[in-house]
From Swiss-Prot:
This is Semaphorin-3ab. Pfam families: Sema (PF01403). Residues 735-751 have a biased composition (Polar residues). Residues 1-17 form the signal peptide. Keywords: Developmental protein, Differentiation, Disulfide bond, Glycoprotein, Immunoglobulin domain, Neurogenesis, Secreted, Signal.
Length: 778
């Protein structure tokens, strides 16, 4: 068989699915749209800063809406970006470690490039004109003030001249996380406080008070924690009750788990805690912690836990005392890889902190609830001279301090709202790393739109929609967008409601993307409704940003059901007319008894594809059913063996939520097999010709990387034309070569005769003569 057709057969064998009926996989949990990095750039929906040549680790973000700037801490640098466009008006501060510090770090056995540098870990607003920044300082933490000016017009961005010791504010090791927040001139930070990375603590530094921290070397307080975030949440209208909440994960305390495990935690501190008088001096006296549970109940009573807390976002509500907490978790197991998002209410958290304390008791010294008398005031309560008469924690009785020291953990865990995650991902090749949430006003209510970063450089846009009640939520994955040029973990995310933009940080750079891309959903009312994006609605002419104003009553939107038949039924004929006008027409050719693949892929990954066939000269259309010869796939229609009766027009339709859209009209012409010899008539290929080997390789590459659906037809046509051209060129070259050789031979013979005649004339008296020989040209 001709080598080209062997290659065609090989390629179709590779791309064709297994024989038999292929069941449609569930599409409810896949993103409706999945644009690539290139598509995001080409659609002007992504701006990227690809990093500095001598820097990396763009992990620390500080969003300043008033100045319109995004401050980013990286390796040896602090950067300032314009919120409108991160590639416009960039500012840079270089803050490397001193050569002596780098040498000391190197002599300690640390990596010069990855560890012996100043990795910025803390960026907090200090006052109206300055930021407070801290870095690892090549394993010698250092802090300084950064002047940014009072207004953006000041165009000020410079590092202060005085530096402070960063111990208790920034970790020594750049691989360790730090959670920090600057409140009323005091810095609350969860970090490591020693060179070896073993002394983890929650610190309060700066301000007019003495620094304070958690108890040292006591695993009941902290057991090798990894801090995630710090938040101030008011407890009541009385400022004396304000509490600081810390989110972290740590190793389970002995006895909590049979094997070594990680638990997610929430910890609380009173803002007005100044330590004890005789015990716990300069140590927290109001520190309590509880386990955060995010699990899926099992049928056999064994729950599947997501214990690795990765990120936390607080969604503000009308009541500042009761924000909704969104938390991202991953699994600890190396076998089972998954991610989840759970929601928590402050009411449930406060109920746990008012519940029983964890206490070791019994013959096995296991953890049980403490049921004896609890000293007054209850440990964990903030001092208040208004209610309990204690002006400071230094006034607490000794039994309160002693109890607080030995009972920092609560017995009951905090369960998520509805006792179930709102999002679970276990069948994907990525894990969640970051989350931000935006509350969006839609036509039928408010929705929280989640933007979730992954460890593969993608962002998921997800909205939770109530099926019947708010206790039964449906996860709708709108988009999965690639926002970095290569797979890399997203380690920082900030959302600007003013600019309606999302900012993302990673080890290799910073990216910016809009919160909504309504124009990409399509040009029809039905496509806009099918998107179920709370940001978008059909305005009568296009899918555009939805604004909840009384003047725009013609907006069409259905987030809860996504039903285009109810929202756009009166526009169906208009959409169909537009669809017919913009329908893609293609013509392809196939050879009888060979294979052919008709490619058709819908924009929406949730759409189902079906095909119709119309013979030439007929009006009615027949639906194509998959069988042994014809196989429908998600990428198109594969006809294993073409017949003459397969010639005709093929229609590719996408069906989603009852809405049918025609994507492609394709005309297939089948060439009879008896014409094949005439079309492909040529000499057998010379396998010893190196040029022919190159043709084999080029033809093979063209087949395995087709530029278009009918690339095989185009390739065959190119090969036929090329071979005919080569035959003509070969014949012309042979004829020209023969003519040229005859001319040279004739000329050479004439020249030889003339030369011989001249030699005979000159050398008649010579005794010797040279041997006569033909010229080399002959």
């Amino acid at each position: 068989m001709d080598y080209l057709w062997w290659i065609v057969l090989l390629i179709w064998t590779l791309i064709a699915p297994e024989r038999g009926t292929v069941a449609q996989r569930s599409k409810s949990n896949v993103p409706r749209l999945k644009p690539s990095y290139k598509e995001m750039l080409e659609s002007n929906n992504l701006l990227t800063f690809n990093g500095l040549a001598n820097s990396s680790a763009y992990h620390t973000f500080l969003l300043d809406e008033e100045r319109g700037r995004l401050f980013v801490g990286a390796k040896d640098h602090v950067l300032s970006f314009n919120l409108v466009d991160i590639n416009m008006d960039q500012q840079l501060i270089s803050w490397p470690s001193s050569p002596s510090r780098r040498d000391e770090c190197k002599w300690a056995g640390k990596d010069v490039q990855k560890e012996c540098a100043n990795f910025i870990k803390v960026l907090q607003p200090f006052n109206q004109t300055h930021l407070y920044a801290c870095g690892t300082g090549a394993f010698h933490p250092v802090c300084a003030h950064v002047e940014v000016g009072k207004r953006s017009e000041d165009n000020t961005f410079r590092l202060g001249s005085s530096f402070e010791n960063g111990r208790g504010k920034s970790p020594y090791d750049p691989k360790l996380q730090t959670a920090s927040m600057l409140i009323d001139g005091e810095l609350y930070a969860g970090t490591s406080a020693d060179f070896m990375g073993r002394d983890f603590a929650i610190f309060r530094t700066l301000g007019k008070h003495h620094p304070i921290r958690t108890e040292q070397h006591d695993s009941r307080w902290l057991n090798d924690p990894r801090f995630v975030s710090v938040h101030l949440i008011p407890e009541s209208d009385n400022a004396e009750d304000d509490k600081i909440y810390l989110f972290f994960r740590e190793n389970a305390i002995d006895g909590e788990q049979i094997s070594k495990a990680t638990h997610a935690r929430i910890g609380q501190l009173c803002k007005n805690d100044f330590g004890g008088h005789r015990s716990l001096v300069n140590k927290w006296t109001t520190f309590l912690k509880a386990r955060l549970v995010c699990s899926v109940p099992g049928l056999n009573g064994i729950d599947t836990h997501f214990d690795e807390l990765q990120d936390v976002f607080l969604m503000s509500s009308k009541d500042p005392k009761n924000p909704i907490i969104y938390a991202v978790f991953t699994t600890s197991s190396n076998i089972f890889k998954g991610s989840a998002v759970c929601m928590y209410s402050m009411a449930d958290i406060r109920r746990v902190f008012l519940g029983p304390y964890a206490h070791r008791d019994g013959p096995n010294y296991q953890w049980v609830p403490f049921l004896n008398r609890v000293p007054y005031p209850r440990p964990g309560t903030c001092p208040s001279k208004t209610f309990d008469g204690f002006e400071s924690t230094k006034d607490f009785p000794d039994d309160v301090i002693t109890f607080a020291r030995s009972h920092p953990a609560m017995y009951n865990p905090v369960f998520p709202i509805n006792n179930h995650p709102i999002i679970i991902k276990t069948d994907v090749d990525y894990q969640f790393t970051q989350i931000v949430v935006d509350r969006v006003e839609a036509e039928d209510g408010q929705y929280d739109v989640m933007f979730i970063g992954t460890d593969m450089g993608t962002v998921l846009k997800v909205v939770s929609i109530p099926r019947g009640t708010w206790h039964d939520l449906e996860e709708v994955l709108l988009e999965e967008m690639t926002v970095f040029r290569e797979p890399t973990a997203i380690t920082a995310m900030e959302l600007s409601t003013k600019q309606q933009q999302l900012y993302l940080g990673s080890a290799i750079g910073v990216s910016q993307m809009p919160l909504h891309r309504c124009d990409v959903y399509g040009k029809a009312c039905a496509e806009c409704c099918l998107a179920r994006d709370p940001y978008c609605a059909w305005d009568g002419s296009q899918c555009s940003r939805y604004f909840p104003t009384a003047k725009r009553r013609t907006r069409r939107q259905d987030i809860r059901n996504g039903d285009p038949l109810t929202q756009c039924s009166d526009l169906q004929h208009h959409d169909e007319a537009d669809g017919e006008a913009g329908l893609l027409d293609k013509t392809v050719y196939g050879v009888e008894n060979s294979s052919s693949f008709l490619e058709c892929s819908p924009k929406s990954q949730r759409a189902l594809i079906y095909w119709q066939f119309q013979r030439h000269g007929e009006d009615h259309k027949l639906e194509i059913k998959s069988d042994e010869r014809v196989l429908g796939t998600e990428q198109g229609l594969l006809i294993r063996s073409l017949h003459q009766k397969d010639s005709g027009v093929y229609y590719c339709h996408a069906v989603e939520h009852g809405f049918i859209q025609t994507l492609l009209r394709l005309t297939l012409n089948v060439i009879p097999a008896e014409h094949l010899d005439d079309l492909l008539h040529r000499d057998p290929p010379d396998t010893n010709d190196p040029a022919n080997g190159k043709m084999w390789y080029r033809d093979f590459l063209s087949l395995i990387n087709p530029p278009s659906p009918n690339s095989v037809d185009q390739l065959c046509e190119q090969v036929w034309k090329r071979e005919r051209k080569q035959r003509r060129q070969k014949a012309n070259l042979l004829h020209a070569s023969q003519s040229h050789t005859s001319q040279i031979l004739h000329s050479s013979q004439s020249h030889a005769k003339w030369k011989l005649l001249q030699e005979n004339k000159k050398g008649r008296n010579r005794r010797t003569h040279e041997m006569q020989r033909a010229p080399r040209s002959v």
